[in-house]
Amino acid sequence: MKLDYFETDGQSYYEAVIWDKTGNTQLLAECYTTKNEAKRAVRNFVKNYKGTKVIVPENCFVRQFDEDECAIEDYEVY
C-alpha cells in the first residue's frame, strides 16, 4: 500500500527511489508498506516515463527504513 510521508512515522517502510543519470534530479520518491510494491512502483515509473531525463538502472532502487526513519538497506530493482 502506498503511504504518505506523514503516515510513515513509527513503522518500517520502503521508499521507491529514482534519480536521473546525473544524480541531480530525483524523479520518484514514494513510500510503500512492502518491498515488492516499491519495486513495482519503480518498474512502472520507468516503463511509463515520458520525460527528457535519462534514467539508468543503478539509480533505480528501493530503500528500506526502520520505525525511526533510519535507512537500513538499499535493494536493486534492475
What is the meaning of each model-derived region?
Residues 1-26, 55:
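Short aromatic-glycine-(Arg/Gly/Cys) micro-motifs in beta-strand/loop hairpins
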Residues 11, 37, 73-75:
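Extended rod-forming repeat segments used as scaffolds/tethers
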Residues 17-21, 32, 66, 75-78:
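Secondary-structure transition/turn motif
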Residues 24-40:
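A short, exposed loop/beta-hairpin motif centered on an aromatic-Gly-Thr core
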Residues 47-78:
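Short, mixed-charge low-complexity intrinsically disordered segments
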